[in-house]
């Protein structure tokens, strides 16, 4: 904001000096700590939103978790992520031509609609829960368009019929190619022969640009890349069950912005150490910071299950 003195209404005893302009700028106040109630619900659904938290500004941004299916990387490489908060899964077909992929091909493909807790579910159908972009379901988008396979994609609302019975005609088929410095996406239901087409430009403000296959709209998949540290949502995670670690979709997953450079450490404490008396020395002596998305994940709580007597937020 710029202020400039142009004239004076009082002339006697006053005059305009040599400094006639002043610039006033505002910057965010860096938070020293506080409390936030995450607005993950919308009244109709318990975990309707993905909640992005900016710790330095003590602020949050909500994005509807079902507002997008695929995210397109805005960095130097060409990569696509699945929206695990919408329980999105994907598997490659055997073909590279959109029109050549039919419902018959979908019937021969692995059943990506299988429940995450079933024996038929494969972790290969989702992206790496640690956030490693070299381990996504789509893989690197090749420079040669003819090398990119058509993928079958399904999210929570289009995996099966409403009664849970199988219906692979609900799935989408998607082919992604490079388009200059951005992406070109061909998509439609598996029975479509003519694709819908959308071009997506990289936006350096964001880590990813989202695309809704239902509406065809390009949307904000996340908060701005430098304006969030952690995200709370329903999402894919590795949870410790009675039988051991299980990869599944779960509530209350906390994800770190590893793509944006955030590093996270877990520091175990004794009963005498609380949030209020936790010190910097506790971090430097015990912390092992990792640039992984799932360092927190679901580890901050114990899920309710048969045989568990201490379900809830952990105290250590």
What kind of feature is each model-predicted range?
Residues 3-7:
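Short, aromatic- and glycine-rich surface loops/edge beta-strands on solvent-exposed regions
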Residues 13-316:
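Surface-exposed, beta-sheet-biased, low-hydrophobicity segments with strongly acidic/polar composition
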């Amino acid at each position: 904001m710029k202020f400039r003195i142009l004239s004076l209404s009082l002339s006697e005893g006053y005059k305009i000096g040599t400094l006639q302009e002043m610039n006033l700028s505002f910057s965010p106040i860096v938070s020293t700590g506080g409390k936030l109630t995450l607005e993950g619900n919308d009244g109709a659904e318990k975990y309707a939103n993905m909640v992005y938290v900016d710790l330095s500004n003590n602020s949050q941004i909500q994005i509807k978790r079902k507002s997008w299916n695929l995210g397109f990387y805005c960095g130097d490489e060409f990569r696509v992520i699945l929206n695990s908060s919408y329980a999105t899964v994907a598997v490659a077909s055997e073909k590279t031509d959109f029109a050549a992929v039919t419902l018959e091909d979908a019937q021969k493909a692995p059943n990506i609609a299988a429940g995450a807790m079933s024996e038929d579910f494969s972790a290969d159908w989702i992206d790496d829960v640690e956030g490693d972009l070299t381990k996504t379901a789509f893989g690197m988008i090749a420079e040669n368009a003819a090398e990119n396979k058509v993928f079958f994609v399904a999210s929570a609302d289009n995996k099966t019929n409403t009664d849970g019975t199988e219906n692979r005609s609900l799935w989408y088929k998607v082919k992604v190619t490079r388009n200059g410095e951005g992406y070109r996406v061909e998509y439609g239901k598996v029975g479509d022969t003519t694709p819908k087409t959308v071009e997506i430009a990289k936006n350096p403000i964001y880590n990813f640009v989202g695309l809704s296959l239902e509406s065809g709209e390009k949307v904000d998949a996340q908060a701005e890349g430098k304006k969030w540290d952690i995200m709370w949502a329903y999402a894919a995670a590795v949870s410790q069950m009675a039988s051991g670690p299980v990869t599944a979709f779960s509530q209350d997953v906390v994800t770190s912005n590893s793509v944006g450079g955030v590093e996270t450490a877990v520091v175990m404490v004794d009963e005498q150490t609380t949030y209020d008396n936790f010190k910097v020395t506790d971090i430097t002596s015990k912390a092992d910071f990792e640039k992984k998305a799932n360092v927190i994940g679901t580890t901050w709580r114990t899920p309710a299950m048969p045989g568990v007597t201490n379900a809830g937020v952990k105290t250590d």
